[in-house]
Amino acid sequence: AICSLVLYLLALMLMEKLSSNTVDAQEVELIWTILPAIVLILLALPSLQILYMMDEIDEPDLTLKAIGHQWYWSYEYTDFKDLSFDSYMIPTTELPSGHFRLLEVDHRVVVPTESPIRVIVTAGDVLHSWAVPTLGVKTDAIPGRLNQTSFITTRPGIFYGQCSEICGANHSYMPIVVESTPLPYFESWSTLLSTSSL
């Protein structure tokens, strides 16, 4: 339908005796150049503002800092004093029966269920990516830059992820395990972890 209309208007313009006025009309060209530019600017400005507002996380219950290294993750619970640990993959030779190969870690990230969690992600050496697909989270870890993301777990459980950026020879040995627990269990875990040394 659109092609037919364009062909009809083109034929009308070519057969008309006054076509020279339409073909050389600089005013028309100026209007159909400036008007779409103004419309695009009017669409872009609010869209950029909304894009930045979507990235803001209002009052999370917990802030977690994930730092990517070759080839493990370090975690800091910034709302707690001295609550940080390194998380390494458990080698296949030491893996308990029934656990997932290449996905289990020695220290899991524990978060409270039904609480907004902010994750600040960075790297200490090369590019990494903190990704837990079942939580809908993937954030690039870039040295010297802090990226943030957020998630809420709606049920208790264990969620598996991995580094999603090729970061070297042992890239596939950087699993991420997030354990979501009810708030009382999280509080007892954080108390126990902060009093003991890893």
Curated annotation (Swiss-Prot):
Reactions listed under catalytic activity: 4 Fe(II)-[cytochrome c] + O2 + 8 H(+)(in) = 4 Fe(III)-[cytochrome c] + 2 H2O + 4 H(+)(out)
Topological domain ranges for the Mitochondrial intermembrane compartment: 55-198
Membrane topology note: Multi-pass membrane protein
GO terms assigned for molecular function: copper ion binding; cytochrome-c oxidase activity
EC id: 7.1.1.9
Biological process (GO), any one: ATP synthesis coupled electron transport
Mitochondrial matrix face residues: 14-26
Subunit record text: Component of the cytochrome c oxidase (complex IV, CIV), a multisubunit enzyme composed of 14 subunits. The complex is composed of a catalytic core of 3 subunits MT-CO1, MT-CO2 and MT-CO3, encoded in the mitochondrial DNA, and 11 supernumerary subunits COX4I, COX5A, COX5B, COX6A, COX6B, COX6C, COX7A, COX7B, COX7C, COX8 and NDUFA4, which are encoded in the nuclear genome.
PANTHER family per UniProt: CYTOCHROME C OXIDASE SUBUNIT 2 (PTHR22888:SF9), CYTOCHROME C OXIDASE, SUBUNIT II (PTHR22888)
Protein's name in the database: Cytochrome c oxidase subunit 2
